[in-house]
């Protein structure tokens, strides 16, 4: 029989949260280090830049693995790395482009394996919803960040929609702004500025 938690049991649970600064905690609060993230956005919304900025910030708290299934390490990806000065995260940030589901599991089973795993994108990975759930259950102390394509302002595909529902942090990037729509909302009305010049350009259109 599975354990049933009492209110006292639940109140006694402790979480290690991300101790990040105001730039991040205002829009996103202080999520647990092992919280699951779901980030969606249309093409050219600033989503990729936001994900890279988040990855760089998380390097302060552990090793980050970026599964770049969608872009690989093409010229655009390289330019984004340079623009965001990802060289400052040398030794904490790793990128793989063609790792299989089984190979990822083998990597994560090793000592000192990555603490934060960014899957970009869920659709291009071609994993099924049960695969994603099984991965998070198998490695409950790790943080999985799922990046999703969109179609008509919604995550593309039924599996992505289901995955969004179960993730702790639900982020949508629109017009170079990242909004928290999930369970750990920060300050009301706040958002993360991905690219200020981009926001200004939209205002003046």
Region spans (language model):
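Phosphate-handling catalytic cores of nucleic-acid transaction enzymes
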Residues: 13-14, 201
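Conserved P-loop
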Residues: 33-102
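Conserved small/polar residues in nucleotide/adenosyl-binding loops
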Residues: 203-205
């Amino acid at each position: 029989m599975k354990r049933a938690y009492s209110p006292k049991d639940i109140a006694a649970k402790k979480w290690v949260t991300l101790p990040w600064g105001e730039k991040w905690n205002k829009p996103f609060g202080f999520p647990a280090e092992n919280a699951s993230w779901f980030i969606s956005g249309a093409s050219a919304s600033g989503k990729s830049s936001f994900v890279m900025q988040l990855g760089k910030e998380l390097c302060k708290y552990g090793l980050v693995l970026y599964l770049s299934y969608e872009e690989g390490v093409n010229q655009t990806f390289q330019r984004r790395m340079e623009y965001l000065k990802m060289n400052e995260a040398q030794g904490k940030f790793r990128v793989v482009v063609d790792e299989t589901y089984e190979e990822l599991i083998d990597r994560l089973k090793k000592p000192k394996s990555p603490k934060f795993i960014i899957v970009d994108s869920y659709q291009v990975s071609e994993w099924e919803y049960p695969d994603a759930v099984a991965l998070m259950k198998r490695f409950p102390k790790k943080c999985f960040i799922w990046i999703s394509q969109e179609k008509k302002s919604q995550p593309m595909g039924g599996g992505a929609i289901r995955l969004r529902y179960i993730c702790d942090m639900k982020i949508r990037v629109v017009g170079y702004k990242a909004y928290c729509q999930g369970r750990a909302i920060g300050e009301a009305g706040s958002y993360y500025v991905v690219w200020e010049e981009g926001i200004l350009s939209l205002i003046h259109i």
